[in-house]
Curated annotation (Swiss-Prot):
Chain positions covered by the region annotation Disordered: 1064-1102
GO CC aspect terms: cytoplasm; membrane
Superkingdom of the source species: Eukaryota
Keyword Iron (UniProt): no
uDENN domain mapped to chain residues: 7-171
Chain ranges of the PH domain: 1767-1871
Organismal lineage: Eukaryota, Metazoa, Chordata, Craniata, Vertebrata
Record has Nuclease as a keyword: no
Name under which the protein is recorded: Myotubularin-related protein 13
Domain GRAM positions: 869-955
Length: 1873
């Protein structure tokens, strides 16, 4: 029984306090003194008016709401507030006097103008909101209606009323005002009472929002409601708290927060709070609070909060069930015949149905929770711990964030303490979680009707709990007269007589004491255990065969104990792999425990090693997130198994299993301790019952009394039931017995912890240990790594900065154990005396154990070493040498799964045992797989030293010994990863020496120290200048170029030039690029004389060598001018080759010979160069052979010269030339004008003018130009644009941002200045379907020259309209972006470890790298520039410094537009010209020099090769080289095997003497050139040749740049573990290698022709070559067998092609032939995808790799010839009128512009041509009129005639549009001829 009301309070407006805000004060309170058991709530006046005490000018309705207050003991107090407004006349004294005077004068009483609030407050510990509303309403009614009832009686009756708490009883009572009220108590006080609040909350916010709030509360987030109704706030908070039942909210719960306490919202603790909507402006700044708007029906979740959702499938099931309950009409909404009426449940029942859904949810979440309760003590109070890790593990939700947070919260801790005891009152949830969970699961899997039925059953019980008596007694409560609050004259609420009320209260209390009712006895019972914990996800779909794996583990253990070493070695790898599964680990512990019970724990050395390895393997997966079951089961086994080291010394297994983080995890020790204590308590009470009561009371105890199957919870329930009946002495004995049990167990665990934490050797070196990642002593889950002896000293104590010693280790272990003892003993109720005695005991235990271990360690070192595999030395390249001693290592698996078997199947090649070798060129691992089944194979993984991008020290889980060891992880730019763990015999000094040597060869002091200059050479080393030896950076200033070159002994430059004094201007190349890398700037100054225009005799030798360079040979091929003085130049030449830069005085990063306009003098080039970064002025690089458009490249503009560029139309009125800047700007203008003059000649010859619109570009101006061509009005040439949001892209915003990626550039024919629009990266989803939408963004004319420059530099440029030149602003990605993208690409393709997140897939990682996005932009820009040049416009590219993106784009444009560059010779010339001569910074970008050591690898050249690979994929017949050639270049441009890519420019190569070579003197040559190497290979083998090569003379290639068409380059992924990378091989195999191959060949013949091919191990294209390569190899083999001279493969290939043509001609003579005899056309149409050729290993090259088609494809070639007969430019159906019978028949017509024919066939599938019209004979193509017999329904305009010299052909198309198209096509074909 309890008081209905603890306090009644009257609170009114405080007139005494002044200020802007009003205040309230307590006018009266009853009782006047505090109850002893219930203190008076402080600050009640704040909560009466949560919005503040404010006066009102209106008469307001009385309001009612309930405020919930929580006291210091966490008890709730419900404050019901009824507020009404009183007329307030006496505001100020003067006003009152004035009003009284007026009343006397007028004789009238004036109505009040101001009203003050007054609150009647009822404070109670009971939650009866409707009773409170009725009681306060009754008091207000008595006051407002002036009833003849004493308020004093009402209040005293209210305060003294006694009501039952729970149990479902009813009580009638009256306050004495004619009222009759009924209190209905709920059946269970543990079940929340909600009324209709839950249903109301779902109506206000909806299902999804309420579920979000539900998750937020359970995961301890802050939730804030706001509404304009205080009652709604209270209901919402009540509903949300009720939804989390059976949990109880244990954080601040304030349904209505007063305005004065809003700062509470900034508290760091979670809360549920409600505030009035008037405070919205003050709550929106809260960053970590989830705000729910009850009136608007929305919730706002801040970005910083990640809400953990309910785990699936529970979330889906809950949403479906809520939808069933709240929206029952959904089921019949689609019915054709809707039911007459759908029964709508009452809102009170609906409320309970919604709660039933959440009850079902919690029953499923907490299913089996009682099986994870750990009972530590029973008496005097039960102490229960929850095994959270076991629960999560068994439920399969270890990684689930939601449940982890729920179980870690305070609410769940209260749930365990309240519901953990096995003997207590039970409620609805206990029954549900124990018996109904399986039914819930079945219902969810079957149909909705069963779900709804169960929900309604639960709802009925919840409803019955709130309304236990269906027949309610009659209630009567007087209510105020309607509108009574609007009365004009109302007397104020009268003040009650305090003494009278107090007397009446005392009288009532006396009566209650006389008739006191006994409290309701709680009915306790044994809590049912319920169903066990099961996984929340059905695991029926598991692919693993657990039974077979368990059998493997059992057999292996059996072989170990039976000492069958051979069988053990065979099964051990499989058993270790099986131990990855939990069931196998459980099996291991059970089997080992059986052998311990059989006293077979003493093992020999071999058995001991096997058992320890299996233990370590089982332990390595027991991380902090698991349930620790395996580790706890292995704990006693590790202290049982041992081996004898000597007569008196034994070594236990625990000394060898210390390398696991689980032992350093305090949570593990606590959980294991509590589990063992629980078992000991169970044994204690089982023993007590069997011993004491078994004989005397056998019948009373029954069958279960001595049943060993009884759980500890069963025993505890019985003990708790009997506890009140026991005597004090017996109770005290039980308490002491339990404490002794806990104390003895604490001593036992202290010993166990000493065993596992004290290392075998405290003086062990630190090689295999690293510092802890966290505070070890805090019990974190950081992995503690140590040596095989188990030293964890560094991790134990992070406080001391001194070196670890034995004493430090002992102290650290003591501190760790002491903290553990303190925690578990305090929680277990152990007395302080026992805890102190344990503290004294621990140091002694540690000291004794350390002393014991000294002998063990001493004896263990005398054991003979384990026999290890023999180290196999790898084959080396010519000139390659070993640098240091090989390190024995274990090659550990990385994140790639291919070689590890597992889910992908295949052999377990990794891990492999072997050695790591360091040579002058590579790091090589060579070894054998540890798995005995593939142990005969050889594993090789190698990395060129120069390509290493990162090496770091790591801790590796040794897969052989299952312990942590130090390792090394080496990542390479060749997409390789070497991850090794060092063997025990490898000392720290050996590792340090290895790393020092590695860094020495990674960054050699000089390029002549690189492997490229040492490979197989016997010439003496060249002595470089001293300054070169001191400064490894090549950014030095050479006094004269000649000195460096002469010292290198490579070339002779004119002596006059060397000896001449400096007379020229000193030019400085100062890189001032904005936003670029400082590392990209070159700060070298030119101190050399500027040579004159005529060549001196002494420089002829230099010129002779320069003209042999690739640049000049390409200039000659393109007819770009000659090197001659002005008197001998041809006037027809518009460009010339200047030798001004032959000594690199003009620009150090440019080649010696440059192509410039004919009219520009050499003297002006110096000034022009100043306007560009690093003096890289624009020069001609290539000319389109068809349109004569030229491609120019240069560096970006200097910002200071941009301002003065083309300021006005009149260039002669520029600033005077006295200033260096102004003169440079003038020369720049002149240079550009000269370029335009030279370009315009060809541009006009192509039929272009400044105002014409190219039809091929499909440009149609949006509006007519208002100014003429010669207009003097200055116009912006940069068109309007839409800014893109992509940062750091090649083209963001500017003119680019208006266009999105179209389907294919070839077909769209988009206008010319949509360039950068296609480069917008993140808008690829948008595709314009109408060209008019694009043209509104484009220029209205085509210019002769387009200058592509940086947007930042070109902003504000203004040009004369007549210049016929336009700027195109481009934004490009900086170097930092490319680096980042490459790193992400490397991590995606070559991950270092398996991803922990299941969502981290390979494709997702590739997408996040944005590598394809960058490739897309480069190709797209190149395609558009190529289109511009095809249309006759020239292009100048001046981006960044001119050596990165510029080089990529310029090279790709030439590949697209010139077939020559798609040959082997042409591609070589392109690389030499654009990349080497024009100064791409290979040394810096590839991180090859010491100066670039900190800059990182930037894959500019690799991106270019990837772009070429993408084009090669789309046009496989257009390239002479195959994709293997590209991979070969990609590998060796960073390998340092060849000298080609070593330096940054021709200037540096000249300075180092490597630019020119004396071909006559072979001994003086240094280093190998990659091009010569490739040429020699190509003469002998077809490894670089593309069998599909069939070039055409059509227009430029137009590849699609859409990301969807780009393909992953296999270079990033492929691996050949049998031989290492297939790019390092030698041309001539040695005799030894040849004999090896012969032996292996004979062996293969004996075994048969079948061979297993493993993609990650074998070179598939070598062991399984295509048909053509196979046939060529066979021919070569037969020639050798017949002792014939081998024929060159090129001749053989040509003969084969001729034979194919002859066969095709014969087949063509047969009219019934169904197959077209044309190989090339077949290749073009089908785009056959052929695999690349691979290369052999370093031992042999006879088995040439594949190049083209496989065997199935090769059989098709006999049907095709290479005749070009099937070129189809346009095709379709036309009706043709017969010549003889004049009949109209449909025919399939093909227009062939190559053969100049119009052929026709019977149908589109027909391959036999029925006839053709020679277009050379066509005279006219004209529209025609319909004739007799024409096809029906034909359009009159669909007819046209083709008149030839022989006859007139009549045609009819399908419609007028098609007819016009055919006429245009034929007309264009005729005009082009």
């Amino acid at each position: 029984m309890a008081r209905l009301a603890d306090y009644f309070i009257v609170v009114g407006y405080d007139h005494e306090k002044t200020g802007s805000e009003g205040f309230g004060k307590i006018i009266q309170r009853f009782p006047m003194t505090d109850w002893s058991d219930t203190p008076f709530p402080q600050g009640i006046e704040l909560f009466c008016q949560p919005g503040g005490w404010q006066l009102s000018r209106e008469r307001k309705q009385p309001t009612f709401f309930i405020v919930v207050l929580t006291d210091i003991d966490s008890d709730r107090h419900y404050c019901a507030c009824l507020t009404f407004y009183e007329a307030e006349i006496n505001l100020q004294g003067t006003k009152r006097e004035h009003s009284e005077t007026e009343e006397e004068d007028s004789g009238l009483i004036q109505p009040a103008q101001v009203f003050a609030p007054k609150s009647l407050v009822l404070v109670s510990r009971l939650d009866y909101p409707e009773i409170f509303r009725a009681c306060l309403g009754l008091i207000y009614t008595v006051y407002i209606d002036s009833l003849n009832v004493s308020l004093e009686n009402l209040v005293s009756n209210l305060v003294t009323c006694i009501v039952p708490c729970a149990g479902g009883s009813q009580k009638l009572f009256s306050l004495g005002a004619g009222d009759r009220q009924l209190i209905q108590t709920p059946l269970h006080d543990s079940l929340p009472v909600t009324g209709t609040s839950v249903a109301l909350l779902f109506q206000q916010l909806g299902i999804q929002n309420v579920l979000s709030l539900f998750c937020a509360v359970l995961t301890e987030n802050k939730v804030l409601f706001h509404s304009s109704s205080f009652q709604r706030l209270g209901d919402a908070c009540r509903a949300l708290e009720a939804l989390i039942y059976p949990l109880k909210y244990s954080y601040p719960y304030i349904p209505i927060l007063p305005a004065q306490l809003l700062e509470v919202l900034s508290s760091p603790t979670p809360f549920i709070i409600g505030v009035h909507s008037v405070f919205c402006s003050e709550i929106h700044d809260l960053l970590d609070v989830i705000i729910a708007d009850l009136d608007g029906g929305t919730i706002k979740i801040p970005e910083c909060i990640h809400l953990s959702p309910i785990p699936e499938p529970l979330l889906h099931q809950t949403q479906a069930a809520l939808s069933l309950v709240l929206h029952p009409d959904l089921e019949v909404a689609d019915n054709a015949f809707a039911p007459l009426r759908t029964p709508v449940p009452h809102i009170k029942l609906l409320d309970k149905e919604v709660r039933a859904v959440f009850l079902r949810l919690f029953a499923q979440i907490f299913q089996g929770y009682r099986s994870c309760l750990q009972l530590i003590r029973i008496h005097a109070e039960p102490i229960i711990h929850f095994h959270k890790a076991a629960f999560l593990g068994q439920r399969g939700l270890i990684e689930n964030d939601f449940l982890t947070k729920v179980l870690s919260g305070m609410s769940f801790a209260g749930f365990v303490s309240e519901r953990g005891p096995p003997y207590r009152p039970c409620d609805l949830f206990d029954e549900l979680v124990s018996f109904e969970v399986e039914r819930i699961k079945d219902d969810d899997q079957n149909d909705t009707h069963k779900i709804l039925k169960h929900i309604r059953e639960l709802a009925e019980q919840l409803f019955k709990n709130e309304n236990p008596n269906p027949h309610m007694a009659f209630q009567k409560v007087p209510k105020p007269t309607e509108g009574s609050h609007l009365r004009v004259h109302i007397l104020p609420f009268s003040k009650m007589n305090d003494l009278k009320v107090q007397e009446l209260i005392q009288e009532g209390l006396n009566k209650n004491q006389n008739s006191i009712l006994s409290p309701r006895a709680e009915k306790k019972c044994v809590v049912p255990a319920g169903s066990p914990v099961v996984s929340i996800v059905d695991k029926a779909s598991s692919v693993f065969n657990s039974a077979r794996r368990l059998e493997v583990v059992r057999n292996c253990i059996m072989y170990i104990f039976e000492n069958k070493t051979l069988e053990t070695e065979k099964t051990l790898p499989a058993a270790l792999r099986a131990l990855k599964g939990k069931a196998a680990r459980q099996c291991l512990t059970e089997e080992l425990a059986l052998h311990v019970q059989q006293n077979r724990s003493m093992l020999n050395h071999q058995q001991f090693d096997y058992i320890v390895r299996m233990m370590n393997c089982a332990l390595q997966d027991c991380s902090g997130s698991e349930e620790y079951t395996i580790a706890s089961q292995l704990l006693p086994l590790a202290t049982a198994f041992c081996r004898k080291l000597s007569a008196a010394v034994s070594q236990f297994a625990y000394t060898c299993v210390q390398d696991h983080g689980v032992w350093a995890n305090q949570q593990f020790w606590e959980t294991t301790f509590y589990n063992d204590v629980q078992n000991q308590v169970r044994s204690l009470y089982l023993t007590t019952k069997n011993g004491n009561q078994g004989a005397s009371e056998p019948k009373e105890n029954g069958v279960d009394s001595g049943n060993p199957e009884r759980t500890v919870m069963d025993l505890a329930a019985e003990q708790l039931r009997l506890w009140p009946t026991l005597s004090k002495e017996t109770q005290q004995e039980l308490i002491q017995s339990e404490e002794s049990t806990v104390f003895s167990q604490a001593i036992h665990f202290a010993n166990l912890m000493v065993y596992l934490l004290v290392p075998l050797d405290t003086s062990k070196n630190k090689l295999l240990r690293t510092s802890a990642t966290g505070d070890w002593e805090s019990g974190s889950n950081s992995i503690v790594t140590n040596s095989i002896a188990g030293s964890v000293a560094e991790s134990y104590d992070t406080e001391s900065g001194f070196e670890d010693s034995e004493n430090d280790i002992a102290n650290s272990v003591v501190r760790f154990i002491t903290r553990f003892i303190d925690k578990v003993c305090t929680e277990s109720g152990v007395t302080q005396d026992h805890i102190k005695s344990l503290h004294c005991m621990i140091p002694g235990i540690v000291a004794m154990h350390i002393e014991t271990l000294e002998a063990v360690h001493r004896e263990s070192r005398r054991l003979p070493p384990i026999k290890k595999p023999k180290i196999m030395r790898p084959a080396l390249l010519p000139g390659e040498e070993f640098v240091c001693e090989a390190l024995r290592v274990l090659l550990d698996p990385d994140g790639r799964e291919e070689a590890t078997g597992g889910m992908l199947g295949g052999p377990h090649i990794l891990p492999a045992e072997g050695a790591l070798f360091l040579t002058t060129y590579r790091i090589i691992f060579k070894g054998t797989p540890h798995d005995a089944l593939v142990g005969e194979q050889t594993v090789i993984r190698s990395v060129p030293i120069a390509s290493i991008t990162r090496e770091k020290k790591i801790n590796v889980q040794n897969q052989l010994h299952q312990n942590m060891q130090e390792g090394l992880q080496i990542r390479s730019a060749t997409f390789q990863l070497i991850k090794v763990a060092f063997d025990e015999e490898v000392s720290a000094e050996m590792v340090d020496l290895f790393k020092k040597q590695l860094m020495k060869f990674r960054y050699p002091l000089s390029i002549f120290s690189a492997f490229a200059f040492a490979a197989g050479q016997t010439a003496p080393p060249i002595i470089l200048p001293k300054q070169k030896e001191k400064n490894t950076s090549f950014r030095t200033i050479s006094k004269t170029i000649v000195k460096g070159a002469k010292r290198a002994g490579k070339m002779t430059i004119g002596r006059q030039y060397a000896a001449k004094k400096k007379t020229g201007t000193i030019l400085e190349e100062r890189g001032s690029r904005s936003g670029g890398n400082e590392d990209d700037d070159i700060s070298v100054s030119d101190d050399n004389e500027l040579p004159s225009g005529t060549l001196k005799p002494s420089e002829k030798s230099t010129m002779e060598q320069l003209v042999e360079r690739a640049c000049f040979r390409d200039y000659q091929r393109l007819a770009l001018g000659t090197i001659s003085n002005s008197s001998t130049r041809f006037k027809s030449e518009h460009f010339r080759v200047t030798a001004l830069n032959r000594m690199h005085s003009l620009c150090r990063s440019y080649p010696g010979l440059l192509v410039v306009p004919q009219s520009v003098q050499d003297s002006s080039l110096q000034k022009v160069a100043r306007c560009y970064r690093h003096n890289r002025l624009p020069v001609v690089s290539w000319k389109n052979a068809k349109t004569n458009a030229v491609l120019l490249r240069g560096g970006g503009f200097h910002g200071k010269t941009v301002v003065g560029l083309f300021k006005s139309q009149n260039t002669h009125t520029a600033a005077p030339a006295s200033s260096l800047e102004s003169s440079s700007s003038i020369e720049q203008e002149k240079y550009l004008q000269a370029l335009l003059n030279a370009i315009s000649v060809h541009y006009k010859m192509n039929g272009n003018s400044t105002l014409t619109v190219r039809p091929t570009l499909a440009l149609s101006p949006g509006s007519d130009r208002k100014s003429s061509r010669m207009s003097s009005v200055v116009k912006h040439v940069v068109p309007s644009h839409v800014d893109g949001s992509l940062s750091h892209s090649f083209a963001r915003g500017g003119v680019w941002a208006s266009l999105r990626s179209s389907n294919r550039l070839i077909t769209t024919q988009t206008p010319l200045i949509d360039v950068g629009a296609r480069l917008v990266g993140k808008d690829l989803q948008t595709t314009y379907t109408d060209h008019s939408a694009l043209q509104s963004q484009l220029l209205k004319r085509q210019a002769a020259l387009y200058i592509f420059g940086e947007k930042s530099q070109l902003r504000g440029f203004k040009f004369d309209f007549a210049l016929n030149c336009e700027f195109v602003p481009v934004e490009f990605g900086d170097i930092r972006q490319v680096k980042t993208s490459f790193k992400k690409l490397m991590r995606a393709c070559v991950p270092s470890s398996n991803p922990t997140d299941s969502e981290s897939t390979f494709l997702k990682a590739m997408g996040e790298s944005e590598w394809f996005l960058q490739i897309h932009r480069i190709i797209q820009l190149s395609v558009i520039i190529s289109e511009l040049m095809e249309s006759g416009s020239s292009v100048m590219i001046c981006l960044e410094d001119g050596w990165d993106i510029t080089t990529q784009v310029v090279s790709l444009v030439q590949i697209l537009g010139d077939p020559f560059y798609r040959t082997l010779e042409g591609f070589r010339m392109l690389i030499e010209k654009e990349w080497l001569s024009f100064g791409h910074k290979f040394s810096q970008r590839s991180n090859l020099s010491p100066s670039s050591q900190g800059t990182g690898f930037v894959p500019i050249f690799l991106q270019f090769l990837d772009c070429v690979h993408q084009i090669h994929n789309q046009y496989p017949t257009e390239f002479e080289f195959n994709r293997y050639y590209l991979k070969f270049l990609a590998y060796h441009h960073v390998s340092n095997r060849f000298k080609t890519f070593l330096l940054d420019s021709d200037y540096e190569r000249l300075e180092h003497g490597t630019l020119f070579e004396d071909k006559g003197d072979k001994h003086s040559r240094r280093g190998i050139c990659i091009w010569e190497y490739i040429e020699r290979i190509h003469k002998k083998k077809t490894v670089f040749f593309n069998y599909l090569f069939a070039p055409t003379e059509l227009e430029a290639l137009k590849p699609s740049a859409n990301i969807s068409t780009l393909r992953k380059w296999e270079y990033y992924m492929e691996e050949t573990l049998a031989s290492g990378p297939s790019y390092d091989w030698i041309i001539t195999p040695s005799r030894f290698n040849a004999s090896d191959e012969t032996d292996s060949g004979e062996e293969a013949q004996q075994q048969g022709k079948r061979k297993i091919v493993w993609p990650c191990y074998d070179d598939v294209q070598k062991v399984q070559p295509d048909a053509i390569t196979h046939l060529m190899n066979e021919i070569e083999r037969l020639e050798i067998k017949l002792n014939q001279t081998s024929e060159r493969w090129q001749l053989l290939w040509e003969r084969a092609k001729v034979k194919l043509k002859e066969n095709a001609k014969k087949e063509n003579n047969n009219p019934a032939s169904l197959v077209s005899a044309n190989l090339q056309s077949y290749q073009k149409r089908s785009m056959v995808h052929l695999p690349d050729s691979g290369l052999g290993d370093e031992q042999n090259l006879n088995a040439s790799p594949s190049n083209g088609v496989d065997r199935r494809t090769a059989t098709l070639y006999n049907h095709f010839t290479s005749k070009n007969e099937e070129n189809r430019s346009y095709e379709g159906i036309l009706y043709k009128r017969g010549a003889l019978l004049k009949g109209w028949k449909p025919r399939w017509f093909v227009l062939d512009i190559t053969k100049h024919q119009l052929r026709y066939y019977d149908s589109g599938e027909d391959t036999s041509c029925k006839g053709y019209i020679d277009l050379a004979d066509v005279e006219t193509v004209v529209p025609a009129a319909p004739t007799i017999g024409a096809p029906k329904h034909a359009n009159e305009k669909a007819f046209f005639d083709v008149k030839t010299s022989k006859r007139v052909y009549n045609f009819c198309a399908q419609d007028a549009q098609s007819a016009q198209l055919w006429m245009d096509k034929i007309q264009n074909c005729i005009s082009d001829a």
